[in-house]
Amino acid sequence: MIRVWYALKEGWQQRKALKRYLSEPVLRVNALSELTPERLDKDNIAVLVLDFDGVLAWHDAKTPLPEVERWLTGLCQTIGEQRLALFTNKPKPERMAYFQKRFPSIYLVHGVRKKPYPDGISQVAEYKGIPVHRVALLDDRLLTGMLSVCLAYSQGYYFTKPYHNYLRHPVKESFFSCLRMMERFLIKVLG
């Protein structure tokens, strides 16, 4: 409950910055294929931090979707695993084991408060020895991921077409879809 209150309070203070993710196309990503090595270099990104739920797979999936794994493999082959990190609010053991086995050099954020707290982004910058403004988070939520970007003074990409599986998890996926719609509505109206 404290995290929800924190998100609402900080979201109110950062509402104009959050509105940029809705109004500026350059800050949005509609498909993972839009995040290319060239775009990351153009945006001066040293490390791309990935959320899991909604970005790499639907909620509660144990591994990324096959097309996501192909994209991730291609990105790792071009920019290297050391330029990627994973920061999920649900670091389930199966997910961590998958990344440790399949992509062992991708940094796994651990031991920090969940988003929207900026601790995970700061941890990546500190671990990699780079300024925090050279870290970018790819996330599908405004009041968690994008808010943590604003609070950390880093960069972010708002993932506008998150993965979902309504057949497998109808209640959970509907809940998160409603949350995303409410976030967008509040930021559009109040920002």
Please give the residue ranges for each predicted region.
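Asp-based, Mg2+/Mn2+-dependent phosphohydrolase catalytic module
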Residues: M1-D43, K62, V68-E69, T73-L137, ...
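Asp-based phosphoryl-transfer active-site loop
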Residues: D43-D60
